[in-house]
A protein has these predicted regions:
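Acyl activation and transfer enzymes in specialized metabolism, enriched
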Residues: 1-27, 171
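Acyl-thioester-dependent acyl-group transfer interface
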Residues: 23-171
Length: 171
């Protein structure tokens, strides 16, 4: 209801709220860098797939505080704009095509798998350095009605090294 009042999705609202919450806890030294979240994106909603394998990507919305406009509404508007620009089918397809181009590169195609795996790990670590935390909105969880009365909460276990907040809706 609160997110609707602001004219944004729950994911946009929660992302902006988490960015602001992290900023409130930052030291003066940390404030020099932007707060950047890694937000997983379920690609099945954009590219229908029958595969049971994980089919996701991620976006990295963020905000650089200290440039004058630091209210929640400012962060919310910037986050909304980021989601609109980066969650289009075209933008995600472009990103996926760039990753596929690396995979099909003539020289990289012939590189030993062990070398490729090391390079991928290094690249992931470099990209991850800028990320402050991870926010996973698992969306609505549906359970059979006969089980619903017994459910008080859901637990989620993740394997990220960063601070991660996982949220879901139920009921």
């Amino acid at each position: 209801e609160v997110s609707r009042k602001h004219g944004v999705s729950m994911s946009v609202f929660l992302t902006a709220a988490m960015i602001c919450a992290i900023h409130e806890e930052q030291s003066k030294m940390q404030e020099k860098k932007p707060v950047i979240l890694m937000v997983p994106v379920n690609l099945r909603k954009i590219f229908p797939s029958d595969s049971m394998l994980n089919f996701f990507s991620y976006i990295e919305p963020g905000y650089h505080f200290g440039e004058g406009k630091d209210s929640f509404d400012d962060v919310l508007e910037a986050t909304k704009q980021y989601f609109e620009e980066n969650l289009s089918k075209e933008k995600i397809a472009e990103r996926m095509n760039n990753l596929i181009a690396y995979e099909k590169h003539k020289i990289l195609k012939w590189a030993p798998l062990e070398l490729k795996n090391r390079c991928i790990k290094m690249g992931a670590k470099l990209a991850e350095r800028e990320v402050t935390a991870v926010l996973s909105n698992m969306s609505v969880v549906k359970m059979p009605p006969e089980y619903a009365k017994y459910i008080e909460r859901f637990g989620v276990y993740t394997s990220t090294m960063r601070t991660e907040l996982c949220v879901c809706s139920f009921g």
